[in-house]
Regions:
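Ligand-binding pockets and gating/stacking loops
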Residues: 1-451
Length: 451
């Protein structure tokens, strides 16, 4: 299946984009607020990522209008995003302070801190685990859509989504299974296997509800409370099944079962994500990108992780390979923005009403956590967009082995994202970390300068 066929199968070719009128009925007021996390690995090659249009030092704050930049002002890695300049917010100088403060392998920490802002703890050997939820699951806890959240993985990658106990949320890595889950009724009214399963699910859940009602009078108060908790879970599942059976949206065609290139698989999942958002099936999605191959990048022999990512700070060949690596993901991110920005909605586009966050588990392939490469797009309902915002490194965070000066803790960005989605929170993850002078860095509250 070629690229054009994939686009057609997903309903994303020219003239066949999802339109809001084809989605679930919304209130006559403002459109839904949505958020998508696009998470990749191995940090970045900072000198080939950062923007310094005026030749500014890394030691000063910067606030620049991205639409004023020339093509030459864009860095090699971020150049594919130039066409979306007016809707981007490039954040430079944020840090995973939880990972800086933790006392084990920096690589195994980043994925656990990325969306939680938490202090990761080593489990299963050395792999990090947070003690609380990621921001997407904080938002999902109050979601009323058929799916509270969706988590997709392309080429794998460590989990970045966690429940309120710090347990990893599993990814869906099969686009066909993802489609069947979104559209159990199939397309064109066909009586598909998925639709038959959905009907059976409804019957089973109805029988379970009857069983609960019959048992409840026979139980003690303590057991009845436990049973009612299970009944509520079943009721939630029943509502989800019913909602999916009654989706008032033309489902996209089922995708094929093979993808010649990772870019095709990524585009397939992006199409599913846009369809889910457009149809009102969820407002919260994570797309996790895993490790790319040498062949895809045209890289010389060697291990992407150990030979190139680790050496990109001081080896020109490794830096070139990893620049290509992160540029590839920038191109995929730009394509996701193209899809969202191509759908008219409420006097703007779907991108205007969606916050899309490209973030990473690390800041560099050598396992640093300062100067995190974070790019946001859309979200003009909450943020003053079209800007490069640099936070100078003014806070020396005390780690177990060294001191790292940071601009702002990324916990504050997580708070800002939650607030933008309509939640009232004062902190996400850690509330403070130690500074080298014995005082503490406050990690609570929203990130300044976003509005």
């Amino acid at each position: 299946m070629n690229r054009r066929q994939l686009l057609q199968a997903l309903g994303l070719s020219t003239g066949s984009l999802f339109l809001p009128s084809r989605g679930l009925a919304k209130s006559a007021g403002a459109p839904a607020k949505r958020i998508v996390f696009f998470v990749t690995g191995h940090g970045t090659v900072y000198d080939n990522w950062k923007l310094r249009p005026g030749g500014e030092s890394d030691d000063v704050d910067i606030d620049t209008d991205l639409t004023s930049l020339s093509t030459a002002d864009w860095s090699p890695i971020l150049a594919p995003l130039e066409r979306h300049a007016s809707k981007l917010t490039i954040l430079d100088g944020l840090a995973h302070v939880g990972s800086i403060a933790a006392a084990f392998n920096e690589h195994e920490e980043g994925h656990a801190t990325c969306l939680t802002g938490d202090l990761p703890l080593p489990v299963d050997g050395s792999l990090g685990k947070p003690s609380g939820p990621s921001v997407d699951q904080i938002l999902a806890a109050q979601a009323t859509t058929p799916f509270r959240s969706l988590e997709y993985a392309v080429i794998g990658g460590w989990n970045v989504n966690f429940d309120d106990q710090g347990n990893a949320i599993p990814y869906e890595s099969d686009p066909v299974a993802a489609w069947n889950r979104l559209f159990p009724g199939g397309t064109d009214g066909l009586d598909t296997t998925a639709s038959r399963v959905a009907r059976k699910q409804h019957r089973v859940l109805d029988l379970a509800k009857q069983r609960f009602d019959a048992l409840a009078p026979q139980l003690s108060t303590e057991d009845r409370i436990k049973l009612e908790a299970h009944r509520d879970l079943v009721a939630d599942l029943e509502n989800q099944v019913l909602a999916l059976q009654n989706v008032e949206c033309d489902p996209i065609d089922q995708p094929g079962s093979s993808w010649p290139e990772p870019a095709d698989e990524m585009e397939t999942f992006q199409g599913l994500a846009v369809a889910a958002l457009s149809c009102g099936l969820t407002d919260i999605i994570t797309i996790r990108g895993g490790q790319l191959s040498n062949a895809l990048l045209g890289a010389p022999p060697g291990d992407i992780h150990n030979d190139f990512a680790h050496s990109a700070d001081d080896d020109p060949t490794a830096a070139a390979v990893m620049t290509d690596y992160h540029t590839w993901y920038a191109e995929r991110f730009a394509e996701l923005l193209d899809k969202l920005d191509g759908i008219p909605e409420a006097g703007g586009t779907m991108l205007d009403h969606t916050i899309v966050v490209w973030t990473n588990e690390l800041s560099t392939g050598s396992h640093h956590h300062d100067n995190m490469p974070i790019v946001m797009a859309g979200g003009s309902f909450a943020f003053d967009v079209g800007r490069l915002i640099r936070y100078a490194p003014v806070s020396p965070v005390q780690g177990p082995w060294s001191v790292t000066s940071v601009g702002r803790p990324h916990n504050k960005l997580l708070v800002s994202l939650a607030e933008a989605m309509g939640h009232t929170v004062s902190s996400i993850g850690l509330t403070d970390v130690p500074l080298s002078d014995g005082s503490s860095l406050d990690c609570t509250g929203a990130l300044d300068r976003l509005t």
